[in-house]
Structures are given as C-alpha cells and as structure tokens.
Curated annotation (Swiss-Prot):
This is Bacterial ferritin. GO terms for molecular function: ferric iron binding; ferroxidase activity; heme binding. Iron-storage protein. Its ferroxidase center binds Fe(2+), oxidizes it using dioxygen to Fe(3+), and participates in the subsequent Fe(3+) oxide mineral core formation within the central cavity of the BFR protein shell. Plays a role in protection against iron-mediated oxidative stress. It comes from Neisseria gonorrhoeae. Forms a bacterioferritin (BFR) complex with BfrB. Heterooligomer of 24 subunits, arranged as 12 dimers, that are packed together to form an approximately spherical molecule with a central cavity, in which large amounts of iron can be deposited. Pfam families: Ferritin (PF00210). Residues 1-145 form the Ferritin-like diiron domain. One of its GO terms (biological process) is intracellular iron ion homeostasis. Fe cation 2 binds at residues 51, 93, 127, 130. Its EC number is 1.16.3.1. CDD domains: Bacterioferritin (cd00907). It catalyses: 4 Fe(2+) + O2 + 4 H(+) = 4 Fe(3+) + 2 H2O; Fe(2+)(in) = Fe(2+)(out).
Length: 154
C-alpha cells in the first residue's frame, strides 16, 4: 500500500525518537542496576521494552505504507545520577509527546486515520504511563528527600 510521503517521512522522525528513548532507558536502567536501585532498574527496563514495541509498530507501519524505516536514532541525554536520569527521561517523554501531537495533526490532514490511531495510542502511553510515572518520581524526591527515595528503590 502506498502511503502519504509526508506521513512516512514524519513516522521516520518519530521512529528516531523512539529508538533514542529505548537506548536512553536501556542505559539508565543499567545505571540503576549498577547503583543497586532494583526497583528503578525493573521499571526502566519495562519502559525500554515498551519503547522497543513503539519503534516496532512504527517500523511495521512504515513498511506497510511502502516506506523504508530509517534506523538512525536521535541524540541521547544520559544522566549521571538518579535525579538527572529521571529529568532526562522526562524531557525525552515531553519531546515525544509534542512530536506525536504534530504527527497526529499531519495524519488527520492526510486522512491517514490508521496511522493517526497508532500515534494516538502511543501518545496515551506516553502521557498516562511514562511521563506521569517520571513526574511522580521527581515529586516524591521533592516530598520525602533523595535519601528516603533512594532507600525506597532498593
């Protein structure tokens, strides 16, 4: 099936972001493991798997629309401690959210409602799961302090 070229091109941009998010979560999860924060490792490892699924969904759709997936990822923002990792991941999620909203608008203009629905589902996951959880963690650190938070993540 031949898809709208602007939609395919934009999906490749989104794919680049998903690949970067996956790799960033991968590195951060391994940092958490190295630092002994088992709960953070488990959560970020789960997020990495979800980002991999998002990337796979985009790859499948790009192929279905007759495009070629571009596997170059966007730049990573790697933290050096728990707080900077959480903040970097939250910033990445905000960027993904904004990009998905633009993509949804583009799909509506191109009348590609199947791709739009794919992006809407990923936007829901980004806002309600990923970004929300990261915001909660940063809020907890503010409320109970870093030491108490770190202890809760062992």
């Amino acid at each position: 099936m031949q898809g709208n070229q602007a939609v395919v091109d934009y999906m490749n941009e989104l794919l680049s972001g998903e690949l970067a998010a996956r790799d960033q979560y991968f590195i951060h999860s391994r940092l958490y493991s190295e630092w002994g924060y088992t709960k953070l490792f488990e959560r970020l490892n789960h997020e990495m798997e979800e980002e991999t699924t998002h990337a796979e969904d985009f790859i499948r759709r790009i192929l279905m629309l007759g495009g070629t997936p571009k596997m170059a990822r966007a730049e990573l923002n790697i933290g050096t401690d728990v707080v900077s990792c959480l903040k970097a991941d939250l910033q990445t999620e905000y960027e993904v959210r904004d990009a998905l909203k633009k993509g949804i608008k583009l799909c509506e203009e191109a009348q590609d409602y199947v791709t739009r629905d794919l992006m809407v589902a990923q936007l829901k996951d980004t806002e309600e799961d990923h970004a929300h959880w990261l915001e909660q963690q940063l809020r907890l650190i503010e409320l109970i302090g870093e030491g108490n938070y770190y202890q809760s993540q062992l």
